């Protein structure tokens, strides 16, 4: 099973927030995640981005790949190297 770290949309129409999840890459965008790793609110004034770095490192360590968006958010907000 190939695992991806990607965003899962939540919220109301025109007021989204996102969960950072580990999910099978073949699953639907809003499918059942393997694990919820954090959250991202793009509408908040300070673009709140909170993740569990230990779990992200675990998933990346066992071969999961981060989506382009998640990789960019992590690089922008944290001191974690993302291997693509």
UniProtKB/Swiss-Prot annotation:
Belongs to the bacterial ribosomal protein bS16 family. It holds the Pfam family Ribosomal_S16. PANTHER family: 30S RIBOSOMAL PROTEIN S16 (PTHR12919), SMALL RIBOSOMAL SUBUNIT PROTEIN BS16M (PTHR12919:SF20). One of its GO terms (biological process) is translation. The keyword Ribosomal protein applies. It comes from Endomicrobium trichonymphae. Signal peptide: none annotated. This is Small ribosomal subunit protein bS16. It comes from the Bacteria. Keywords: Ribonucleoprotein, Ribosomal protein. Gene3D superfamilies: 3.30.1320.10. GO terms for cellular component: cytoplasm; small ribosomal subunit. One of its GO terms (molecular function) is structural constituent of ribosome.
